[in-house]
Amino acid sequence: MGTYLSSPKTEKLSEDGENDKLRFGLSSMQGWRATMEDAHAAILDLDDKTSFFGVYDGHGGKVVAKFCAKYLHQQVISNEAYKTGDVETSLRRAFFRMDDMMQGQRGWRELAVLGDKMNKFSGMIEGFIWSPRSGDTNNQPDSWPLEDGPHSDFTGPTSGCTACVALIKDKKLFVANAGDSRCVISRKSQAYNLSKDHKPDLEVEKERILKAGGFIHAGRINGSLNLTRAIGDMEFKQNKFLPSEKQMVTADPDINTIDLCDDDDFLVVACDGIWDCMSSQELVDFIHEQLKSETKLSTVCEKVVDRCLAPDTATGEGCDNMTIILVQFKKPNPSETEPEDSKPEPSEDEPSSSS
């Protein structure tokens, strides 16, 4: 259940933004938890045709979530597959790349900085002074040079995070997910789940865990982790005879691609602190109701978070960190709309309706 405070921290980190195609609002709150382990990324213009939104829910610490919020979108856009138009492959590679980048001296140093264990100016870490050699650092997002140092054999963090990201490019939406954060789209006020929660009771997940040498006890891998896909959690990825996608816990994302249409109202990406309190349809209904009187999307997100916050910690529900990103699609002006017979039809592979 985690450690709870005597009273919740209700201060919120909220943000709004827009471009010519969409606008977004977000809000994040620590709540009853002793620490804040969520992180997020909201990049309106990843390039001139692309927006990116990601929620990263940390467990066992905050550093992996913060690492992903800083680097995952950079790895998507810098990948050769992205440059050739293969967004799905680029997303998948970026998820796996996070695990690779967090290993070795460079990975250890980055995590130490994000975890506030390193003095960013002196390089002093818990009493040990070390600084990277001149020329070891590189500001290019697609470059990750190896560094020599006392932690060159670091195999990666034992903590981890979920990753649920939505990439909007032209009229296509790509959703990549590992873990139990969730992406939902409202289409004509109906909620459609664009991701699925990765839990040990799913047959495909259970089969992979057992084949990798793990077991499931009380709904947790090896009696410990209640997620089957995550970035980080390297202790569950040490079977040297298996590729990354077949480890007990894998960063391999499910990827869902849909065509956006004029029936789409908005998109939500949120951590399980929200979904544990509201179903997908309940949240969509709540947001529609709020939008009748509120135009600032971050305020709508704040109302969602307040709605989910528990009055006490008796049940544990409503006591988690909470992060929600709300993305609203701008409708074209009547003068800009296409002739009736050329309007895009909803995708035949319409998202599965939420239960």
Swiss-Prot record:
It catalyses: O-phospho-L-seryl-[protein] + H2O = L-seryl-[protein] + phosphate; O-phospho-L-threonyl-[protein] + H2O = L-threonyl-[protein] + phosphate. GO terms for cellular component: vacuole. One of its GO terms (molecular function) is protein serine/threonine phosphatase activity. Mn(2+) 2 binds at D57, D272, D320. Binds 2 magnesium or manganese ions per subunit. Its EC number is 3.1.3.16. Its cofactor is Mg(2+); Mn(2+). Residues 23-329 form the PPM-type phosphatase domain. Mn(2+) 1 binds at D57, G58. Belongs to the PP2C family. This is Probable protein phosphatase 2C 21. The gene is PPC4-2. Residues 329-355 are annotated as: Disordered. Keywords: Hydrolase, Magnesium, Manganese, Metal-binding, Protein phosphatase. Signal peptide: none annotated. SUPFAM superfamilies: PP2C-like. PANTHER family: PROTEIN PHOSPHATASE 2C (PTHR13832), PROTEIN PHOSPHATASE 2C 21-RELATED (PTHR13832:SF631).
